[in-house]
Amino acid sequence: MANAIVEKAKERMSHSHQNLAREFGAVRAGRANASLLDRISVEYYGVETPLNQIASITIPEARVLLVTPFDKSSLKDIERAINASDLGITPASDGSVIRLVIPALTEETRRDLAKEVKKIGENAKIAIRNIRRDAMDEAKKQEKAKEITEDELKTLEKDIQKVTDDAVKHIDEMTAHKEKELLEV
């Protein structure tokens, strides 16, 4: 039972890492990345549909995304959705494909994005600490209910803290890597 608490905490922390990676993927680093378009939904035959389900997204050059709709009639809808998004990229359509040229980042923009990355990383660490708190509370409840001994509680708390420390270290590494990527010229 005690191991289940640690395993559940590990699993929840793993989900936090995946969410962080997804959020970092949405922060543009001055080079083309298909994940920039992951959050864009297009109204396609009256239904909000993720862009990657109605078009192929390729990267022909370092700073260019090429969006090729499977159905050419959806080109205008895709263009409208990209314009409405908060990407800050203007789509250029030639009738069959949409080219998105990713502008080079200014030094100021890079610093702002690095601050945003730090904030996202800090929020992920807060989520990890909340998971630790929940796991510790669960362990204390079990000890109070006499399901585990006081010694087992101490061991469990150490295990939970080790898992938490590893998760926070991983978040710090991910954040540092993304910051480095952003600040490269």
Swiss-Prot record:
Which compartments is it annotated to reside in? Answer: Cytoplasm
- Please provide one cellular component term from the Gene Ontology annotations of this protein: cytoplasm
Highest taxon listed in the record's lineage: Bacteria
**What species was this sequence derived from?**
Streptococcus gordonii (strain Challis / ATCC 35105 / BCRC 15272 / CH1 / DL1 / V288)
Q: What does this protein do, in the record's words?
A: Responsible for the release of ribosomes from messenger RNA at the termination of protein biosynthesis. May increase the efficiency of translation by recycling ribosomes from one round of translation to another.
Mind telling me which Gene3D superfamilies this protein's record contains?
Answer: 3.30.1360.40, Ribosome-recycling factor
Provide the gene name from the record: frr
> Known Pfam families for this protein?
RRF (PF01765)
Q: Which GO terms describe its molecular function?
A: ribosomal large subunit binding
UniProt family annotation: Belongs to the RRF family.
Q: What is this protein called?
A: Ribosome-recycling factor
Q: Which HAMAP family match?
A: RRF (MF_00040)
Q: What is its main location?
A: cytoplasm
Q: Which GO terms describe its biological process?
A: translational termination
Transmembrane parts of this sequence:
none
Record keywords: Cytoplasm, Protein biosynthesis
